[in-house]
Amino acid sequence: MLSLSKNWNTLIKPNKVAYENFPETNNKAKIVVEPLERGFGLTLGNAMRRVLLSSLQGAAITSIKIPAIEHEFSSIPGVKEDVSEVILNIKGIEVKMHVAEKRIMKLKATGPCVITAGMIETGHDVEILNPDHVICNLAKNKQLEMELTCKVGKGYVLSTNSYEDNLPIGEIAIDALFNPVKSVTYKVENTRVGQVTDYDKLIMFVETNGDLLPEMAVGLAARILQEQLQLFISFEEQEEDKQVKTDALPFSPYLLKRVDELELSVRSANCLKNDNIIYIGDLVKRTESDMLRTPNFGRKSLNEIKEILAKFNLRFGMDVPDWPPENIQELSNRYEDSYN
């Protein structure tokens, strides 16, 4: 029964994951995954988004201590904002920790000045990721001292759910957002494999606070999903004979080789990519006239590809029976040793 149900190897799998960082910052990235089976773009995109926004570990300020201030419904002499406003601003400070243990940071300032996160004395184990973030405004000849406790955690923890129930008198717990991922959006578009045009392309946009690069955040989220889903596999796979008879195909196994594995010039490779030619089988079914009608594809590119095809005893304008096969991705993986 398992052999009949074992189709996870026949489903089309992404060729690669493409990361594109935005030029103004390394904290934003566009991630493109293709091709995927129909419906898998939405399935994977939604799962990855939920994990990215809820389950990654990061650091945050969890409590503050200001001399002579015992609760958030107070005012600080010489400070324009009341304590609740100061706490709200402190919640916006983004931090990165290099150790797992909590650290206490200190802030000392004399007015008049605008107090920012960059004025906090952090030590070597903590970094402030947004040093220009405003905490409060201090009046002339006034002083402010504050201790800020920083910890590692995950998700969003309310001050009322703080895991330290017995804080010292005068220490005020604050809501803590540990997650290093600030936003995740995704969309699903159609993509083409051979002559099939309705596979999924997953496009994700991920922004972090700088604690992690988007590529690392996506990798960690995928690892978390992998660990959780592993528990659902309730059977054992038997090692199968991987020897494949090449004469079982109605065409040459070289047709299953991807054109991006050929040593083509950049111009030729881009022309094939723009024309959605994925496999050599897609290529040899075209005639020379078809190729010359391709935008930016000239006689020089044609001769270059003809020489490469000749090495495999292939040519343009071939009649290939049963092309493209339905399980082209699986066949390409199975016959890889035959054409490499």
Curated annotation (Swiss-Prot):
It catalyses: RNA(n) + a ribonucleoside 5'-triphosphate = RNA(n+1) + diphosphate. Disulfide bonds: none annotated. One of its GO terms (molecular function) is protein dimerization activity. The keyword Lyase does not apply. Pfam families: RNA_pol_A_bac, RNA_pol_A_CTD, RNA_pol_L. Keywords: DNA-directed RNA polymerase, Nucleotidyltransferase, Transcription, Transferase. SUPFAM superfamilies: C-terminal domain of RNA polymerase alpha subunit (SSF47789), Insert subdomain of RNA polymerase alpha subunit (SSF56553), RBP11-like subunits of RNA polymerase (SSF55257). Residues 1-236 are annotated as: Alpha N-terminal domain (alpha-NTD). Gene3D superfamilies: 5' to 3' exonuclease, C-terminal subdomain (1.10.150.20), DNA-directed RNA polymerase, insert domain (2.170.120.12), RNA polymerase, RBP11-like subunit (3.30.1360.10). Its EC number is 2.7.7.6. GO terms for cellular component: cytoplasm; DNA-directed RNA polymerase complex. GO terms for biological process: DNA-templated transcription. SMART domains: RPOLD. Residues 246-340 are annotated as: Alpha C-terminal domain (alpha-CTD). DNA-dependent RNA polymerase catalyzes the transcription of DNA into RNA using the four ribonucleoside triphosphates as substrates. Belongs to the RNA polymerase alpha chain family. The N-terminal domain is essential for RNAP assembly and basal transcription, whereas the C-terminal domain is involved in interaction with transcriptional regulators and with upstream promoter elements. Homodimer. The RNAP catalytic core consists of 2 alpha, 1 beta, 1 beta' and 1 omega subunit. When a sigma factor is associated with the core the holoenzyme is formed, which can initiate transcription. This is DNA-directed RNA polymerase subunit alpha. It comes from Rickettsia felis (strain ATCC VR-1525 / URRWXCal2).
